[in-house]
Amino acid sequence: MQHERMNRPLIIRTLGRTDYLATWQAMQAYTQSRDEHSHDELWLTEHAPIYTLGLNRKGVRLPSRHDIPLIEVDRGGKITYHGPGQVVIYVLLDLKRRGMSVRSLVSAMEDSMIALLAEHGVTAAARADAPGVYVEGAKIASLGLRLKHQRSYHGLALNIDMDLAPFLAIDPCGYQGLQVTQVRDLGIALTSEAAAQKLLDKLTTQLGYTDRLTENTL
């Protein structure tokens, strides 16, 4: 029975642009309803402009602009921005069933993005003091997770081809003056759609899945 559960296909949901609040609530509901037979899932999406404030709120500078909504959420970390042209992948895994630590999951997420950039000649790295992926000190991807009963939700956001100006109104991830960058500005000619598929392939491999199914709805 344990072998059967470990080899259930990974479900990849390609959702297009979604409402942040509705997607967050769907993640919570799925995680709450999970049992030992539930599939692990990756949700690929993109959001309309929104700031999200994680659970680590001490000393956070709130956005200096008010034309973009701000929502308080239950992931780790501080404040970040989501918007069109950014690849978002939510990671809904049963870590206990997979024998995976949170640190291993974070590393898999970071390593998949680092490998994607390396394919295009860009050297990127993670930082122990600030989860995410960086290119020459500028942040190109953010991470944030929540665990309930060793089941994860939330995930990663990789900047592809977006308006970076909203990041100027915050201290990304709580770091004053932290620069941000994106795939387009590094001279990589990848659409969000192409980058998303490449990243899904790499993340699936990093997580150790060999069988996956794709669906387009929640």
UniProtKB/Swiss-Prot annotation:
Pathway: Protein modification; protein lipoylation via endogenous pathway; protein N(6)-(lipoyl)lysine from octanoyl-[acyl-carrier-protein]: step 1/2
Any single biological process term in GO: protein modification process
Keywords from the named record: Acyltransferase, Cytoplasm, Transferase
EC number(s) per entry: 2.3.1.181
Listed InterPro entries: aa-tRNA-synth_II/BPL/LPL (IPR045864), BPL_LPL_catalytic (IPR004143), Octanoyltransferase (IPR000544), Octanoyltransferase_CS (IPR020605)
Any Pfam family: LplA-B_cat
Reaction equation(s) it catalyzes: octanoyl-[ACP] + L-lysyl-[protein] = N(6)-octanoyl-L-lysyl-[protein] + holo-[ACP] + H(+)
Name of the protein: Octanoyltransferase
Organism, as annotated: Methylobacillus flagellatus (strain ATCC 51484 / DSM 6875 / VKM B-1610 / KT)
